[in-house]
Regions:
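Catalytic cores of alpha/beta
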Residues: 35, 80-90, 123-131, 168-184
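Conserved N-terminal beta1-alpha1 strand-loop-helix module at the mouth
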Residues: 1-91, 110, 159, 170-171, ...
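Long, low-complexity, intrinsically disordered segments
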Residues: 224-228
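Conserved functional loop/turn residues at catalytic and ligand-binding sites
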Residues: 43, 67, 91, 99, ...
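Glycine-rich phosphate-binding active-site loops on the catalytic face of alpha/beta enzymes
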Residues: 97-104, 137-146, 180-203
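Hydrophobic faces of well-ordered beta-strands that scaffold small-molecule active sites
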Residues: 20-24, 47-49, 73-76, 95-96, ...
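Histidine/lysine/aspartate-rich catalytic loop segments that bind and position anionic ligands
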Residues: 94, 98-144
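Short, ordered loop/turn segments at secondary-structure junctions
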Residues: 51-52, 78, 100-102, 120-121, ...
């Protein structure tokens, strides 16, 4: 199935519309593929395959070829330029990093790919913006107070598009969105390692559906949104 080339603006918009980036960490290629199918079945057409997954580049390449037309496939835990280049060549439509590395942003810029660097403090957020980051991952957000921390960051940075990651779950997802999060990065609370290992994909699909509902509940109905 042909993959539609998306602009950075398209990817940013889709991330915001979906509101959730599932972070897939798996012990094998097979587990990663099963996780993606379970997540998509739950109504979340976007995944972040981390570099900690065995043969992550091959997983990304295969997913892009098989599901890239209807699922946004990204690469996570990208920490250096070499990884970034490999992910782009594999077809990753966005890159996510746990921290801020200028070389990763540079590779993404050359290839016209969205990169979502990690930051935690206001200074790190400002540095990311200065380097051209349009969307920033706030990690590990849970250790800083969760939704309250996002609300605090949005006060001096009202236009920042923030994706809290770490400590995000169905119980606080709506609160994060209400606090001003652009989207949410969700890992173990969605992709349950035991369920994946045991083949209990229904648990992951159900968790995805609950997250989708939680995010939707915190957003105004489409009919209430003002058109620009």
């Amino acid at each position: 199935m042909p993959v539609t080339e998306l602009s950075i603006e398209d990817v940013i918009r889709r991330v915001g519309e979906i509101g959730i980036i599932p972070v897939v960490r798996a012990a094998s290629v097979e587990e990663a593929n099963r996780a993606v199918e379970a997540i998509c079945a739950g109504g979340i057409p976007i995944v972040e395959i981390t570099m900690t997954v065995p043969n992550a580049i091959s997983v990304i390449r295969e997913l892009v070829q098989r599901r890239g037309a209807d699922v946004l496939i990204g690469a996570g835990t990208v920490t250096n330029a070499e990884q970034a280049e490999s992910c782009v060549r594999a077809g990753a439509q966005f890159l996510v990093s746990p921290g801020l590395t200028a070389s990763v942003l540079s590779v993404a810029r050359v290839h016209d790919r969205l990169v979502i660097p990690g930051a935690l403090t206001p200074t790190e957020l400002m540095n990311a913006q200065e380097l051209g980051a349009r969307v920033v991952k706030i990690f590990p957000c849970g250790s800083m107070g969760g939704p309250k921390y996002i609300k605090s960051l949005k006060a001096p940075f009202p236009h920042a598009q923030l994706i809290p990651t770490g400590g995000v779950n169905a119980g606080n997802a709506a609160e994060f969105i209400a606090a001003g999060a652009y989207a949410l990065g969700v890992g173990a609370d969605l992709v349950d390692a035991a369920a994946l290992r045991e083949g209990n994909l229904g648990k992951i699909t159900s968790a995805a559906k609950v997250l989708v509902q939680a995010v939707a509940s915190a957003r105004p109905a489409k009919s209430d949104k003002k058109t620009n």
